[in-house]
Amino acid sequence: VPAPWTDAAIVPAARRFMNMVGQVPIVVNREVEGFILNRLQGALLNEAWALFEEGYASVEDIDLTVSHGLGFRWCFMGPFETIDLNAPGGVADYARRLGPLYHSIAKARSNPKPWNEDLAGRVEAERRQKLAIDQLPERSAWRDRRLMALLRHKNTQSDT
């Protein structure tokens, strides 16, 4: 996040350096609470908690929707590139076709609820049925190995 007094040459130079060392830098044009990743993750998490709380799906089915649906695509491309490819006429076509639906969905969640202890306890109970608390370190290590394998794969592929 460049400050107002940051020299204009610093951000592109920092981006080049980060790319050179194998990182994928994100430029945040101005300060925003939570930065970019946490805000996007927060939107998805808030909807996941609400869908579970309102009885639309189980914790497992919500996780599967993300890991085998959105996450499957999003590990290679972001939301805008995804929708650009999901309509014959690209992003503008997608926005015309589905913008009203997504706007209606967003309006329905204009007053998000906090994640309360009761709800967290219910989610916790479903998760513990799938994975005992003492198995978290082993599952985390499994996740990390999978992430490293995915990273190796992505690093060997072209973006085009």
Task: State where each predicted segment sits.
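NAD(P)-dependent Rossmann-like dehydrogenase/reductase catalytic/cofactor-binding core
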Residues: A9-P12, N19-E31, E54, V59-T160
